[in-house]
Curated annotation (Swiss-Prot):
The lineage of its organism: Eukaryota, Metazoa, Chordata, Craniata, Vertebrata. GO terms for cellular component: mitochondrial membrane. It comes from Azemiops feae. InterPro entries: NADH_UbQ_OxRdtase, ND/Mrp_TM. GO terms for molecular function: NADH dehydrogenase (ubiquinone) activity; ubiquinone binding. This is NADH-ubiquinone oxidoreductase chain 4. It catalyses: a ubiquinone + NADH + 5 H(+)(in) = a ubiquinol + NAD(+) + 4 H(+)(out). Keywords: Electron transport, Membrane, Mitochondrion, NAD, Respiratory chain, Translocase, Transmembrane, Transmembrane helix, Transport, Ubiquinone. Its EC number is 7.1.1.2.
């Protein structure tokens, strides 16, 4: 069920990050060198999850692996125990909660009309669902972390804190963000561009679907304008 995927991506996945924040508060901040293996694993895991996204042909699997890669950045940022890292991790959890839930919602909108989640079979949706294409574009731009969204602010805070802690981390961080941009654009172009393969009649998008997307993206945009509410 799509509701389960949306709640899982938006709330349950972030509870792990919240748990790590609570545990880290009980540990001494001077011992961050002890956590180097965990930070390395988190960044390497984020990069591997992003590489897995590039191999996916299933739309829902791609979005799920995308959530895993973002949580790798969150874990790395929390583990170094700096104010910037903690603020960036909290902001990214909130921003990606909205974004990944919106992506799952859009994937279901596509699935209800095409009855498939294979990327190559869902192409050309721009021709039959033009309004949904706008939502796809906005959500993918937020997933890539383009300014001035909260995703950009949070990833910038995480990159700054990790780079200040150890400049070498910029290699895995930069690679991870480059791959994120690649698979997000690939997902958008695979589903929207090209000729449509659908021969049957397709119903247009409903008002409830537009309302659902607006309830995801408008709060995220409003928080992006005033990030000090959560940072």
């Amino acid at each position: 069920p799509i509701a389960g995927s949306m709640v899982l991506a938006a709330i349950l996945l972030k509870l792990g990050g919240y748990g790590i924040i609570r545990i880290m508060q009980t540990l001494p901040t001077t011992k961050t060198d002890l956590f180097i293996p965990f930070i390395t694993l988190a960044l390497w895991g984020a990069t591997l999850a992003n590489l897995t996204c590039l191999q996916q042909t299933d739309l829902k699997s791609l979005i799920a692996y995308s959530s895993i890669s973002h949580m790798g950045l969150v874990v790395a940022a929390i583990t170094i125990q700096t104010p910037w890292g903690l603020s960036g991790a909290m902001a990214l959890m909130i921003a990606h909660g909205f974004t990944s839930s919106a992506l799952f919602c859009l994937a279901n909108t596509t699935y209800e009309r095409t009855h498939t989640r294979v990327l190559i079979l869902t192409r050309g949706l721009h021709n039959i669902l033009p309004m949904a294409t706008t939502w796809w574009l906005l959500t993918n731009l937020m997933n890539i972390a383009t300014p001035p969204t909260l995703n950009f602010t949070s990833e910038l805070l995480i990159m700054s804190s990790l780079f200040n802690w150890c400049p070498t981390t910029i290699i895995l961080l930069g690679l991870s963000m480059l791959i994120t941009a690649s698979y997000s654009l690939h997902m958008f172009l695979s589903t929207q561009a090209g000729p449509t393969l659908l021969n049957n009649q397709t119903e247009p998008t409903h008002s409830r679907e537009h309302l659902l997307m607006a309830l995801h993206l408008i709060p995220l945009m409003l928080i992006s304008m005033k990030p000090e509410l959560i940072i």
